[in-house]
Amino acid sequence: LNPAVTIALWLFACFDKRKVVPFIISQVAGAFCAAALVYGLYYNLFVDFEQTHHIVRGSVESLDLAGIFSTYPNPHINFVQAFAVEMVITAILMGLILALTDDGNGVPRGPLAPLLIGLLIAVIGASMGPLTGFAMNPARDFGPKMFAGLAGWGEIAFTGGRDIPYFLVPLFGPIVGAILGAFAYRKFIGRHLPCDICVVEEKDSTAATQQNASL
């Protein structure tokens, strides 16, 4: 569900590269459709709020409503700081994902893994959420931004009212962070565990060797 995680798994966990682009397209499309569904269900409330507070859709004041669909930064942090926040929190998330899915580290598996990941996301949201909205997922941010742009917010949905288009931060920050997090895990932790990275490839190679030996 996260293009940043998909790309990191492709680079460091032998995820099939043929699935990367279809996965990312599906993830963005899913987020776009989810935003459209929310807008359709709450349409009357959007209109009523705008009329009550005299908000013109597409203005800077309308960003509060656009924030229902995607993330926008705290007005007191700059572009570079926002990028750093998204990069760091996604690196932490990616490191935990690899730790929980690594066969060699002996951590609890099964139904406990999603719970631990969910708890980490909750902690990140509570601690770093006020800074950038903790996107950590290019699909869940860019897909809804595209919908908001089409639904009347226009350019402001992508720029966030800033000189440098803000959509670049939650689009590329998590990708860079996930890659760095996966690299750090493989470099400093995974390499010391009694487990190879590409288990699937090893199994395929072993099966092929056995098949050739039987011929």
Language model regions located:
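Membrane-interface helix-loop junctions and terminal tails of multi-pass membrane proteins
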Residues: 1-215
